[in-house]
Amino acid sequence: MPKMKSHRGACKRFKKTASGKVKRERMYGSHNLEKKNRKRTRRLHQSTLVDSTQEKQIKRMILA
């Protein structure tokens, strides 16, 4: 059986932490920032963890 290939788009978007959880960046934080207040843009630049309901599928895509 051939080797499994990882999903390259998912590998660019998600990283596995040392404890085994999956980290992601928030959306809506890259442009049109003048319409958003400072508190919101600061929060959008922080990374967060993937929800536990989707963690299994993403780990399978990035082969982690």
UniProtKB/Swiss-Prot annotation:
Family matches, as InterPro entries = Ribosomal_bL35, Ribosomal_bL35-like, Ribosomal_bL35_CS, Ribosomal_bL35_sf
Chain segments carrying region Disordered: 1-64
Q: Which cysteines are joined by disulfide bonds?
A: none
Q: Which family does it belong to?
A: Belongs to the bacterial ribosomal protein bL35 family.
Q: Coiled-coil annotation: which residues?
A: none
- Comp. bias intervals (Basic and acidic residues): 25-35
Q: Select a single GO molecular function from the record's annotations and give it.
A: structural constituent of ribosome
- Residue ranges annotated as compositionally biased, kind Basic residues, are 1-24, 36-45
Among the GO biological process terms of this entry, one is: translation
One short Pfam name that applies is: Ribosomal_L35p
Answer whether the UniProt record assigns the keyword Ribosomal protein to this protein.
yes
* Ribonucleoprotein in keyword set: yes
Question: NCBIfam families attached here?
Answer: rpmI_bact (TIGR00001)
Q: What is this protein called?
A: Large ribosomal subunit protein bL35
What top-level branch of life does the organism fall under? Bacteria
Alphabetical GO CC annotations of the entry are: cytosolic large ribosomal subunit
Q: Which UniProt keywords apply?
A: Ribonucleoprotein, Ribosomal protein
